[in-house]
Curated annotation (Swiss-Prot):
Pfam families: UPF0180. It comes from the Bacteria. This is UPF0180 protein BCAH820_1484. Coiled coil: none annotated. Signal peptide: none annotated. Belongs to the UPF0180 family.
Length: 79
């Protein structure tokens, strides 16, 4: 399964992705995003920790307005 970086405050998303078998990394700094296939951020800060500046090779999913299921579906489609 994929290695997914998830912003610290999105604990429900972290748990759901772990249940699906993904390796979940908590994003506390820009370095945490390195090596991730995809990152999920709250969207409260559109450039959270510089992740939007191509710090990762994968997709960045903004969780704002999405349910946990929506986010999990986006992760599946992008990894």
């Amino acid at each position: 399964m994929a290695r997914i970086g998830v912003e610290n405050s999105l604990t429900d998303v972290q748990q759901a992705l772990k249940q699906q078998g993904h390796e979940v990394v908590t994003l506390n700094s820009e370095q945490d995003a390195q090596g991730c296939d995809c990152c999920v951020v709250t969207g409260q800060d559109s450039n959270m920790m510089g992740i939007a500046d191509a710090s990762i090779k994968g997709s960045v999913i903004t969780a704002h307005g999405l349910t946990t299921d929506d986010i999990c579906q986006q992760v599946e489609s992008r990894t």
